[in-house]
């Protein structure tokens, strides 16, 4: 007969395994972040900004941004995020 978590006093073991997984995940992600911080920035990206790179991208990229309405889409995403956060604050996270 298999014993599930929470039966016959093994609930503590299940919590321990869950905590062990969380600790392993945290250490793994920290190691990946550490390795990424060791990588040097490419020379072509030094002193660049997103606006400067988009300005140098050419008319084709700007045409696609205009056709797909990237600007209004970002405004709508920002408005949705503000609405979500404001709703959470005003309803104390219930709704």
Swiss-Prot record:
Subcellular locations according to the entry: Virion; Host membrane
Annotated keywords: Host membrane, Membrane, Transmembrane, Transmembrane helix, Viral penetration into host cytoplasm, Viral penetration into host cytoplasm via pilus retraction, Virion, Virus entry into host cell
Subunit text: Interacts with G3P; this interaction is required for proper integration of G3P and G6P into the virion.
Record field: transmembrane: 20-40, 44-64, 66-86
Coiled-coil intervals, chain numbering: none
Protein name listed in UniProt: Head virion protein G6P
Source species: Xanthomonas phage phiLf (Bacteriophage phi-Lf)
Membrane topology: Multi-pass membrane protein
Domain of life of the organism encoding this protein: Viruses
Protein family according to the UniProt entry: Belongs to the inovirus G6P protein family.
Function (record text): Plays essential roles both in the entry of the viral genome into the bacterial host and in budding process. The formation of the G3P-G6P complex termed adsorption complex is essential for correct termination of filamentous phage assembly.
Keyword flag Lyase: no
Statement: the UniProt record of this protein carries the keyword Protease: no
Any one of the GO BP annotations: symbiont entry into host cell
GO cellular component terms listed in the entry, alphabetical order: host cell membrane; membrane; virion component
């Amino acid at each position: 007969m298999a014993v599930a978590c929470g039966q016959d006093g093994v609930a503590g073991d299940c919590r321990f395994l869950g905590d062990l997984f969380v600790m392993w995940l945290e250490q793994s992600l920290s190691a990946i972040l550490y390795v990424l911080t060791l990588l040097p920035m490419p020379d072509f990206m030094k002193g660049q900004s997103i606006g400067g790179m988009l300005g140098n991208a050419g008319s084709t990229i700007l045409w696609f941004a205009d056709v797909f309405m990237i600007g209004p889409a970002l405004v709508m995403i920002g408005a949705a995020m503000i609405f979500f956060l404001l709703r959470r604050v005003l309803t104390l996270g219930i709704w």
